[in-house]
């Protein structure tokens, strides 16, 4: 069985909705999904540990955009993982990234690239969204070749669009397929 950690921070629920779409898709394919957050905000939240990363076969990682960068909670966590990096414990694990912003040009692509940096430093294999996912060409909201994204609106009231949901599902499917091939 493939074990996948879906790690996220969500301020207003958009990134959590994306994490759930990706998680549901992974579970549909038969993965053991471990949904994790950086801090416990609700009773059902499970906080990430470094052991979670060591034990997983693949990782999906997302936060809202913070001026084109990852949320501080995520950065703080990744800064504690030097011991994993020194031992090469995440090398060759497939990973993908996802993000949400308030506006169409609110920094999603920059954030997705920023989310990728610690994964690449750890030697993980970064998976994007290939253009055989037709929603990349049809979306009028979120979705990039760098990863799934969402445009929440200035009051964070936009629900995931059908295109954004399909892109999240495509990301989950691709992550599962690559992790399965590698295992």
State each model region's role:
Residues 1-90, 154-183:
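N-terminal beta1-alpha1-beta2 submodule of the flavodoxin-like/Rossmannoid cofactor-binding fold
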Residues 8-9, 67, 77, 98, ...:
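Aromatic side chains
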Residues 64, 70, 108-109, 130, ...:
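Gly/Ser/Thr-rich beta-alpha loop segments that engage phosphate groups in nucleotides
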Residues 79-82, 86, 103, 121, ...:
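Alpha-helix boundary/capping detector
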Residues 94-141:
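Short, glycine-/small-residue-rich phosphate/pyrophosphate-handling segment
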Residues 98-100, 153-156:
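Short, local alpha-helical segments
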Residues 113, 143-145, 162:
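Glycine-rich phosphate-binding loop at the start of an alpha helix
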Residues 137-152:
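Short glycine/proline-rich, acidic loop/turn segments that cap or connect secondary-structure elements
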């Amino acid at each position: 069985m493939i074990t996948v950690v879906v790690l996220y921070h969500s301020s207003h629920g958009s990134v959590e909705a994306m994490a759930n779409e990706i998680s549901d898709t992974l579970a549909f394919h038969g993965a053991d999904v471990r949904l994790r957050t950086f801090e416990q905000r609700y009773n059902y939240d499970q906080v990430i540990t470094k052991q979670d990363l060591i034990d997983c076969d693949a990782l999906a990682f997302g936060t809202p955009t913070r001026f084109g960068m990852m949320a501080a909670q995520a950065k703080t966590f990744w800064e504690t993982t030097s011991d994993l990096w020194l031992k090469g414990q995440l090398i060759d694990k497939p990973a993908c990234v996802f993000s949400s912003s308030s506006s169409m040009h609110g920094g999603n692509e920059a954030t997705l690239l920023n989310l990728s940096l610690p994964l690449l430093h750890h030697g993980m294999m970064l998976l994007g969204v290939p253009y055989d996912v037709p929603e990349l060409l049809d979306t009028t909201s979120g979705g990039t070749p760098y990863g799934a994204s969402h445009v929440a609106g200035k009051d964070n009231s936009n629900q995931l669009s059908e295109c954004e949901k399909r892109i999240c599902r495509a990301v989950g499917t691709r992550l599962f397929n690559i992790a399965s091939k590698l295992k």
